[in-house]
């Protein structure tokens, strides 16, 4: 039985990861760092910006200028303003779901709120929004998901996590929650390889049109 549904944001509710990846690849190329979209997906997907920057510094020995983050975020939000979309059928799912739900994202509060606003989901940027800034350890640690459960007074075993990234799946597994992997984002290759050990979801689905087919009890009865 599920009492709380926890949605990731980027790559689940909104089709943002492909835009973010392309912008990061381009920004780092300006400093002589050559990575591709596959590298971003394998190493950075589902992680917070500070964690990503820490790994870049460690792996490439690169000290980015103090204004790099501000400039990257400004370019990213400009790209979001013209290209960000909500995942198909997400709005319908959020309107019909019959239990408490929230969002748990590695994005900053400002970016998450702005992104949700761009796709008409600004009403979710209040108490339903939980970000990595609220916990000591971000994904793949379970801290953020466990915080969601705690704030809702829900047993983690009765929580359902909807994730796209391996790090998010790992976090959900570590939290002792049921995890469904959404594979319909533009950033994920088709066909998608099997997940490695330690990052196995309980179920997969590639469109929110079939979300309630996976467990009809999640849908509000009319």
Report the location of each language-model feature:
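Short glycine/proline-enriched coil/turn segments at helix->beta-strand junctions
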Residues: 58, 96-101, 176-177
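Asp-based, Mg2+/Mn2+-dependent phosphohydrolase catalytic module
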Residues: 1-3, 95, 108-222
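Metal-dependent phosphoesterase signature
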Residues: 54-92
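Conserved SAM-binding loop
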Residues: 13, 86, 101, 161-162
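Short, acidic loop-to-helix structural element flanking the phosphoryl-transfer center
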Residues: 78-103, 109-113
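Active-site neighborhood of HAD-like aspartate-dependent phosphohydrolases
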Residues: 1-41
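Helix-loop "lid/cap" segments that line or gate small-molecule binding pockets
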Residues: 27-28, 48-63, 115, 149
């Amino acid at each position: 039985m599920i009492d709380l549904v926890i949605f990731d944001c980027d790559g689940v509710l909104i089709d943002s990861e492909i835009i973010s990846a392309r912008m990061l690849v381009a920004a780092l190329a300006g400093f002589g760092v050559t990575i591709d979209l596959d590298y971003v997906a394998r190493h950075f997907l589902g992680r917070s910006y500070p964690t990503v920057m820490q790994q870049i510094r460690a792996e490439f020995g690169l000290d980015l200028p103090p204004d790099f983050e501000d400039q990257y975020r400004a370019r990213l939000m400009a790209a979001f303003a013209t290209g960000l979309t909500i995942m198909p059928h997400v709005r319908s799912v959020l309107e019909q779901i019959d239990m408490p739900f929230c969002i748990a994202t590695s994005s900053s509060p400002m970016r998450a709120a702005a992104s949700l606003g761009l796709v008409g989901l600004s009403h979710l940027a209040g108490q339903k929004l939980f970000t990595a800034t609220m916990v000591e350890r971000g994904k793949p640690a379970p801290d953020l998901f466990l915080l969601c459960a705690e704030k809702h007074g829900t047993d983690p075993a009765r929580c359902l996590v909807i994730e796209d990234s391996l790090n998010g799946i790992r976090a959900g597994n570590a939290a002792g929650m049921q995890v469904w992997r959404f594979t319909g984002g533009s950033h994920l290759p088709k066909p998608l390889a099997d997940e490695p050990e330690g990052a196995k979801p309980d179920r997969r689905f590639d469109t929110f049109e079939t979300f309630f087919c996976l467990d009809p009890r999640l849908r509000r009865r009319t």
